[in-house]
Amino acid sequence: SHNEDKILKSLDKETFSKNVVYVSDAGMPCVSDPGATLVDYCIKNEIPYDVLPGANAILTAYAMSGFSTTTFSFYGFLDHKGVSRASKLDDILNDDKLSILYESPHRLLKLLEELSIKDPNRTIFLAKEITKLHQNSYKDTSLNLFNKFKDINIKGEWVVVIKPKETIGFNLDLNDIQNLDIAPKIKAKLIAKMTGQSIKDVYQKLLEN
């Protein structure tokens, strides 16, 4: 970041002839927190350094989630709005790996609403304030979580773990079904079977699109 570069430029190599410790007051440096610029500086200037494992919400939430998949993608914090946010959400919902991201309490309900519209039956795991006094977790479909979270206290920092997209047959997914050149009623039956939604609701959505 600009601030990291500015601080490093104000230092000389003599600074690093002493034992220097860089810590974060919450989370782990370099993981959605500053720190990577300092590590790169040390590498380029041949300054010996070490990294000690610390609190990591990603791995803790992964272990807590109960999902059996062994691979995941980490998306950090999403953009607040705009095309880039919508595009990233599509990437997440089409990812064949578990998706993990961070979200603030101010935008969590918005995220759940977006997910519930795009894929109401996708299973989501939410972890709040991991390792802290008010730690809590929830696991349900995106639609159920959105409805639940309208009425509860969502203060605190959140980790969101999203189940990979489901495929059927020869890696056939919902987008493949929607793109088939078949009657909407048949599409509706196939999608309803895959997602658990009612045929009537799916058919209506297909007509609207």
Language-model-detected regions and their locations in the chain:
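Short, acidic/turn-prone active-site loops that include or flank metal/cofactor-
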Residues: S1-D5, A55-N56, G76-K81, E129-K132
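Class I S-adenosyl-L-methionine
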Residues: S1-D50, L59-T60
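Short, surface-exposed amphipathic charged segments that create phosphate/polyanion-binding patches used
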Residues: K9-T15, S87-L93, S137-F146
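Short, hinge-like loop/turn segments at secondary-structure boundaries
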Residues: K13-T15, L38-V39, S65-T70, K118-D119, ...
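Short beta-strands and strand-loop turn motifs
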Residues: V21-D25, T71, Y75, F125-K128
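General beta-strand structural signal in soluble alpha/beta enzymes
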Residues: S24, V51-G54, L101, L126
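Class I SAM-dependent methyltransferase SAM-binding "motif I" and its flanking Rossmann-like core
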Residues: T37-D95
